[in-house]
């Protein structure tokens, strides 16, 4: 695991004004005026078949994405191969369910560790896998076959009444079942902290815990669904609706503007803290922050180390180029942040489906 660099909170100047030219410039970013409250996404696609044509996030994915693992599709969606679309109903999958593989698993469950139910094209499933991998936990992944209707197997619906992925079984807690990616990774973070006393991907500070929760809810309710809707209307909706494509793509940009601002302020605080001999020049704007040797150091949304708040964005950042957003050009802080996370061995392992 790469060494974490200390990062202080955004400095308080007493006047509420930004302390350098970086945050001043970023405050000009158009954050939009959307008042959307949509929290559902529907994508009908298996990106596995599209993987050879995709080059998501250029060098960010080299050696890390491992092919189809980084594909796109949210909770609340059943993704099926485009070639088999005619064989399924609108949202429910095939009319006949083959649940034999799922039934066999539930007849002989493990006694320990975790079982993750996911899909090869489900970013939210890989979100959970990343956290499990980062924590070094023992887990096995069952990638459901939606073409067989495995997500509708009675045994699976019993642990996830929403019949979507991801779902997780915690075998150490009498086969406790959890669903919804945000709830799952919060459980993992809290359990790890309680059992070990180490706030891995978490915090022992109550205020920071609240901030982590805020970003996590922002990602699950705003970031992921907007990308999901943009993908749906761009590629798979039965009719071309340019206004819908534009509306959801603009909303994704607005969301990234929020993240970009937060990361930029974190970077500014880090540079002012670690590069104190040049702080006056940075504050005056006579020396750009880009000249600091700390300009490419990792910064995180909350506190001085990576948390579940940061990692929850990774799989979705890896597919956003498919809606025409180049984060390297449009959101450079988001790009650097994603790059640091995509290079982590545990993230690489999880995205490869290992």
From Swiss-Prot:
CDD domains: GST_C_Ure2p, GST_N_Ure2p_like. Residues 64-75 have a biased composition (Gly residues). Residues 1-80 are annotated as: Disordered. Keywords: Nitrate assimilation. GO terms for cellular component: cytoplasm. InterPro entries: Glutathione-S-Trfase_C-like, Glutathione-S-Trfase_C_sf, Glutathione_S-Trfase, Glutathione_S-Trfase_N, GST_C, Thioredoxin-like_sf, Ure2. Disulfide bonds: none annotated. Residues 205-354 form the GST C-terminal domain. Residues 1-56 have a biased composition (Polar residues). GO terms for biological process: negative regulation of transcription by transcription factor localization; nitrate assimilation; protein urmylation; regulation of nitrogen utilization. Homodimer. Plays an important role in the cellular response to the nitrogen source. URE2 gene plays a major part in the repression of GLN1 and GDH2 genes by glutamine, and is required for the inactivation of glutamine synthetase. URE2 gene product may catalytically inactivate GLN3 in response to an increase in the intracellular concentration of glutamine. This is Protein URE2. The gene is URE2.
